[in-house]
Amino acid sequence: MIEFRVDLRSGVSPYLQLVHQVQQALRLGLLREGDQLPTVKEVVAQVAINPNTVLKAYRELEHEGLAAGRPGLGTFITRSLADSSLGAHKALRAELVRWIGKAQTAGLDDKSITALFADTHRRLTVDGVA
C-alpha cells in the first residue's frame, strides 16, 4: 500500500501532491489495477491533512480514470501507468543511484539534485541539448 507524504512548504497543493504520488506509484508499477488506496481516515492520520483534501485528490484520480470509489468498500486503482519495459531498466536505476550519490558527495541537497535533474531533462527533451 502507498504511504503518502505531504510537504506543506513545497508550494504544491497538498491534494496535488497526493495525486502526483499515486501517479508516480502507478508509473513505477508500485500500484496496480485493483489495488485499494488507503482510506481517507488512514491518510488523514498518516499525514495530518484535512479529510476534504484527501477526498479532492481521490476525486481527481477518478476524473483522470485512474481510480474509482466503491461505496462502503473504498477507492481502487482502475488502470496502470506503468511502462511495461520499466522493470527491465535495473541497470539504469543503478546508474541513477550512483549519480545521486555523486551529487550528494558534491554537496548538493535533495532539492538541488531534483532541480539539476529536471533542468537537464527539460533541456534534453525541449531544446534537444543537455
Describe the function of each predicted region.
Residues 1-36, 90-94, 100-130:
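Extreme N-terminal segment that seeds HTH/winged-HTH DNA-binding domains in transcriptional regulators
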Residues 45, 62-63:
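Alpha-helical residues within the helix-turn-helix
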Residues 36-47:
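A short alpha-helical element within helix-turn-helix/winged-helix DNA-binding domains
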